[in-house]
Amino acid sequence: MERTFLMIKPDAVQRNLIGEVISRIERKGLKLVGGKLMQVPMELAETHYGEHQGKPFYNDLISFITSAPVFAMVVEGEDAVNVSRHIIGSTNPSEASPGSIRGDLGLTVGRNIIHGSDSLDSAEREINLWFNENEITSYASPRDAWLYE
């Protein structure tokens, strides 16, 4: 089973959308196997978004992601990276499809509700960055047979 990293950003946490976002992810067949509400330390934010260092939006991005709590999570399922990217929608909410998380709930590019790993390599790196091994669990669910057999 594939795993990916998702992070509900401060704008969604402040708007009380954690439950709505998780519900959409679970209804699509992905299983939450790790999750935590946390204030992002500056060092973690800088490491996570290191690829954007030097870009014009970098400082604002770091400031935003550390401004209020996020809900970091690991989800598991068949083709989890691609399925989650489809549910999330385009980075710019005004270009995201209706029915996607960003299309329905996002406000601007800078306030777009959720981050999701864009590849298996990114997912592995981000999961290892945000979670310790003991914070992620595996469990059988009766619905697995309905989804994957």
Curated annotation (Swiss-Prot):
One of its GO terms (biological process) is UTP biosynthetic process. InterPro entries: NDK-like_dom, NDK-like_dom_sf, Nucleoside_diP_kinase, Nucleoside_diP_kinase_AS. Disulfide bonds: none annotated. ATP binds at residues 9, 57, 85, 91, 102, 112. Its cofactor is Mg(2+). Keywords: ATP-binding, Cytoplasm, Kinase, Magnesium, Metal-binding, Nucleotide metabolism, Nucleotide-binding, Phosphoprotein, Transferase. It catalyses: a 2'-deoxyribonucleoside 5'-diphosphate + ATP = a 2'-deoxyribonucleoside 5'-triphosphate + ADP; a ribonucleoside 5'-diphosphate + ATP = a ribonucleoside 5'-triphosphate + ADP. The active site is at 115 (pros-phosphohistidine intermediate). Its EC number is 2.7.4.6. Pfam families: NDK (PF00334). It is found in: Cytoplasm. GO terms for molecular function: ATP binding; metal ion binding; nucleoside diphosphate kinase activity. GO terms for cellular component: cytoplasm. Homotetramer. PANTHER family: NUCLEOSIDE DIPHOSPHATE KINASE. Belongs to the NDK family. Major role in the synthesis of nucleoside triphosphates other than ATP. The ATP gamma phosphate is transferred to the NDP beta phosphate via a ping-pong mechanism, using a phosphorylated active-site intermediate. NCBIfam families: PRK00668.1. This is Nucleoside diphosphate kinase. The gene is ndk.
